[in-house]
C-alpha cells in the first residue's frame, strides 16, 4: 500500500503532465492551444530536464498531433497528447481512426467553447461533439481526479477487453489554471500499478509483419463497429475494476468509476451533472441539508461508455430530476446529457438546464433556481440558466 507521496499545489494542466510522466509515456505529440498549452509545456520541461525519457514530437497542427500518436501507438508505444476546442475539432478525422485501429491513446482535453464567436473559456461542447468517435470519455471534478484519471486511463485503455483510446476531460481555466493541492504518488508505484504495455495487435516487428488500418469493405466494416460497441460495454466493468484497484493502491476512488452518488438516499430531487460544477452543487446540497431540505447529486464521470444501468438504479426513487448541460444540441434545445437521461428515464420527469456556455459563471443562486424550477415543473422542460434578457 502507498506510504510515501508528495503533495504539490499545482494547476490542472500540471496535474495532467505529472500523470503522463508517472505513466512513463513513450511518445508525446504536442501542439499548443489555450487552455491546455501549459500541459505540453510542462511535459517539454520534463523531457528536457531528463525527468521523462520520451520522444517529444512538435507538430504543426492538432490533426498532426493525433496522427503522430496513431503512428506511434501502432508500433506499440504508450502515447499521450492534449488539446482543446478547435484543436479537438481539427482532430475529428483522426479520432475515428484511433478508435477503429483499437489504439489505447490517452488524451487530456481542456474543455473550451467552440468558435464562432471566438471564446477561450469553458464549456463541454468540444468533447461532447466527439461522443460518437469511439473514445472513452471521463469528466473530472478537480485536479486530483485529473492526475488519478489519466493514470487510470492507461490501465483501462490497454486492457485487452477494451483497447480503446480515452479522453480525460477537465474544465478549461476552472481547473486547468486553478491551483489545488494534489497528491503525487511515487513513480515506481504507478509503473507497478500500470505494468508494461505489450500489445499483441499493434507493434512494429519485421519478423512478424502485420497490416494495420486496412480497407474495411462492406463485408466486414459493420462488424468492426459492433466490436467497438462491445468493447465499450466491456469497458464499464473495466472502469469499475480499475477504480477499485486504484483505491487499493493509492487510497482514492471516484464513486464506482462510472458515476458518483452524493446524498442520494431518500432524495426526491436529484441534480445530474459532469465536471467541476459538481463541486458547487455539493456545496449547495450541504447548505440545503442544514435547512432540512434533502437534494442529491448524481455525477456522471464516464459519459462514454454511458452508465445506463447505474442511472436507472440510482434514480429509481427520484421524482424531480434536473440535468445540467454545458453544451447544447442546436435544433433540439437540449444538451447531450439531458437527451441521454430522458431516453433512459422515460417514465420520470427529467428537466434539462443549459448552463455555463462559453464560460458563463454558474452561481450558487443558479443551482438553487434549478432546484426550485424542477420541483415546480409539471413536465419535462428545458431552461437556459443565467441567460441575459
Swiss-Prot record:
Biological-process GO terms, alphabetical: response to oxidative stress
Enzymatic reactions: 2 oxidized [2Fe-2S]-[ferredoxin] + pyruvate + CoA = 2 reduced [2Fe-2S]-[ferredoxin] + acetyl-CoA + CO2 + H(+)
Gene3D superfamilies given in the database record: 3.40.50.920, 3.40.50.970
Its EC number(s): 1.2.7.1
Keywords carried by this UniProt record: Oxidoreductase
The UniProt record lists the keyword Oxidoreductase: yes
Keyword Oxidoreductase: yes
Domain of life (superkingdom): Archaea
Enzyme class: oxidoreductase
Pfam family, one: POR_N
Gene Ontology terms, MF aspect: pyruvate synthase activity
Subunit structure: Heterotetramer of one alpha, one beta, one delta and one gamma chain.
Protein name: Pyruvate synthase subunit PorA
Lineage: Archaea, Methanobacteriati, Methanobacteriota, Methanomada group, Methanococci
Amino acid at each position: 500500500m502507498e506510504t510515501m507521496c508528495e503533495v504539490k499545489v499545482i494547476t490542472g494542466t500540471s496535474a495532467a503532465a505529472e500523470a503522463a510522466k508517472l505513466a512513463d509515456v513513450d511518445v508525446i505529440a504536442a501542439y499548443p492551444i489555450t487552455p491546455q498549452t501549459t500541459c505540453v509545456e510542462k511535459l517539454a520541461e520534463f523531457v528536457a530536464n531528463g525527468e521523462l525519457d520520451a520522444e517529444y514530437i512538435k507538430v504543426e497542427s492538432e490533426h498532426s498531433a493525433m496522427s503522430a500518436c496513431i503512428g506511434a501507438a501502432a508500433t506499440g508505444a504508450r502515447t499521450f497528447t492534449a488539446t482543446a476546442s478547435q484543436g479537438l475539432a481539427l482532430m475529428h478525422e483522426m479520432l475515428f481512426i484511433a478508435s477503429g485501429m483499437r489504439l489505447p491513446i490517452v488524451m487530456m482535453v481542456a474543455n473550451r467553447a467552440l468558435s464562432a464567436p471566438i471564446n477561450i473559456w469553458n464549456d463541454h461542447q468540444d468533447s461532447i461533439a466527439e461522443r460518437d468517435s469511439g473514445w472513452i470519455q471521463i469528466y473530472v471534478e478537480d485536479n486530483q481526479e485529473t492526475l488519478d484519471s489519466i493514470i487510470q486511463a492507461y490501465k483501462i485503455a490497454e486492457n485487452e477487453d477494451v483497447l480503446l483510446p480515452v479522453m480525460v476531460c477537465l474544465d478549461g481555466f476552472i481547473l486547468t489554471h486553478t491551483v489545488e493541492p494534489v497528491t503525487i504518488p511515487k513513480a515506481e508505484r504507478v509503473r507497478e500499478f500500470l505494468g508494461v504495455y505489450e500489445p499483441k495487435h499493434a507493434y512494429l516487428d519485421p519478423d512478424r509483419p502485420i497490416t494495420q488500418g486496412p480497407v474495411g469493405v462492406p463485408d466486414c466494416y459493420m462488424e468492426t463497429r459492433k466490436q467497438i460497441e462491445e468493447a465499450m460495454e466491456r469497458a464499464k466493468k473495466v472502469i469499475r475494476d480499475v477504480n477499485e484497484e486504484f483505491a487499493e493502491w493509492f487510497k482514492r476512488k471516484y464513486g464506482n468509476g462510472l458515476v458518483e452518488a452524493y446524498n442520494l438516499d431518500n432524495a426526491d430531487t436529484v441534480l445530474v451533472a459532469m465536471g467541476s460544477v459538481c463541486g458547487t452543487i455539493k456545496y449547495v446540497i450541504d447548505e440545503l441539508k442544514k435547512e432540512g431540505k434533502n437534494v442529491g447529486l448524481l455525477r456522471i464521470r464516464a459519459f462514454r461508455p454511458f452508465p445506463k444501468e447505474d442511472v436507472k438504479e440510482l434514480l429509481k426513487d427520484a421524482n424531480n430530476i434536473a440535468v445540467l448541460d454545458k453544451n447544447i444540441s442546436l435544433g433540439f434545445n437540449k444538451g447531450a446529457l439531458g437527451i441521454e437521461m430522458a431516453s433512459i428515464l422515460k417514465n420520470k420527469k427529467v428537466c434539462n438546464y443549459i448552463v455555463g456556455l462559453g464560460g458563463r459563471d454558474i452561481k450558487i443562486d443558479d443551482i438553487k433556481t434549478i432546484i426550485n424550477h424542477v420541483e415546480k415543473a409539471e413536465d419535462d422542460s428545458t431552461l437556459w440558466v443565467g441567460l441575459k434578457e
